[in-house]
Amino acid sequence: MEPSPTTGGSETTRLVGPRDRGGAGGGLRLKSLFTEAPEPLPEEPKPVEMSFHHCHRDPLPQPGLTPERMQAQRQLCTACAVCCVFMAGEVVGGYLAHSLAIMTDAAHLLADVGSMMGSLFSLWLSTRPATRTMTFGWHRSETLGALASVVSLWMVTGILLYLAFIRLLHSDYHIEGGAMLLTASIAVCANLLMAFVLHQAGPPHSHGSRGAEYAPLEEGSGEPLPLGNTSVRAAFVHVLGDLLQSLGVLIASILIYFKPQYKAADPISTFLFSICALGSTAPTLRDVLRVLMEGTPRSVSFEPVRDTLLSVPGVRAIHELHLWSLTFTHYVASAHLAIDSTADPEAVLAEATSRLHSRFGFSSCTLQVEQYQPEMAQCLRCQEPPQA
């Protein structure tokens, strides 16, 4: 058979007779594959661009030694080494000077060493990946380490306050003013060095995403979030409290060196500056408890988030709105959005997620879209929580 043209421009086939055979062999005359241009291949379909949204603006803290964690480890290791050296010196100096204030400062340095070692352990533990049991990973171990640091300082300070009170009641003690002055001067230098090591500058400049160790501002709030690694921040505040106490001990040692009869300055300085150390750790303790109690992040208010979700086109009501922190710098939100029957659920979900990410910096958002029902207005579980 061979194709034959028709008037319609299509091809038909007919039987090939003997007279159409060419050559001695009488084979079939086939249409050559090379006499006509090959038909063009069909074009591959172009990918269709679709609007895409996801529930994560930035990933939650990833397991492994990130640059921020490596920097925190270096800072804590260096400060811990400095602290150990000068703590040993203060123990010797305090013993030789018979100074309770110097021993108090040494005890605070001991608490610093313990808290820094605990922070290093919790920092290492936080690098472990999430599991089916620990679905958020071990990131909160860092917060627990900060809590242990504050609690240890408060316990040691309470003991030293008691000893200072006993010395104020009984004056049967002697203090070597020269040894106390020398040791106090070294202690001030040691605390200044540790504060310099642990000091954290502002967040590095970054394009496109927010760093792992800081969070953006809430739109219109003007209040920045806590900066820096949690463990380093707690250790830095801890050292600042010790620095204040060391300065007080230095002033007391100068007074005792020139006026030995004023030896009561030793327990008095211990009493006053221990209270300052307690007060300096109160903000850290407050922030830690807020995270552990699943409280609303300090830089995010409930009302602006609620109003932002209600302003999304198609949203009639919201309920089950929960805002909490996984760490000091990673916020999580969840809510139920009740929408009109004519609203597009996917469009509402995409717009609401985008607004939460861009305006408040939530790391993860879980939103459930459902049809609005009139009985929601009377449901107790659909009402807003009262003011604290």
From Swiss-Prot:
Polar residues bias: start-end ranges: 1-13
Membrane topology per record: Multi-pass membrane protein
Catalytic activity line of the entry: Zn(2+)(in) + 2 H(+)(out) = Zn(2+)(out) + 2 H(+)(in)
Gene Ontology annotations of biological process type: response to zinc ion; zinc ion transmembrane transport
Molecular-function GO term, any one: zinc ion transmembrane transporter activity
Compartments it resides in: Cytoplasmic vesicle, Secretory vesicle, Synaptic vesicle membrane; Synapse, Synaptosome; Late endosome membrane; Lysosome membrane
GO CC list: late endosome membrane; lysosomal membrane; neuron projection; plasma membrane; synaptic vesicle; synaptic vesicle membrane
Pfam family, one: Cation_efflux
Keywords tagged on the record: Antiport, Cytoplasmic vesicle, Endosome, Ion transport, Lysosome, Membrane, Metal-binding, Synapse, Synaptosome, Transmembrane, Transmembrane helix, Transport, Zinc, Zinc transport
Cell membrane as UniProt keyword: no
Topological domains, Cytoplasmic: 1-75, 127-145, 199-235, 286-388
Annotated segments matching region Disordered: 1-30, 35-54
Positions of transmembrane segments: 76-96, 106-126, 146-166, 178-198, 236-256, 265-285
Family that this chain belongs to: Belongs to the cation diffusion facilitator (CDF) transporter (TC 2.A.4) family. SLC30A subfamily.
Family annotation (PANTHER family): CATION EFFLUX PROTEIN/ ZINC TRANSPORTER (PTHR11562), PROTON-COUPLED ZINC ANTIPORTER SLC30A3-RELATED (PTHR11562:SF30)
Protein's recorded name: Probable proton-coupled zinc antiporter SLC30A3
Species in which this protein is naturally found: Bos taurus
Gene designation per UniProt: SLC30A3
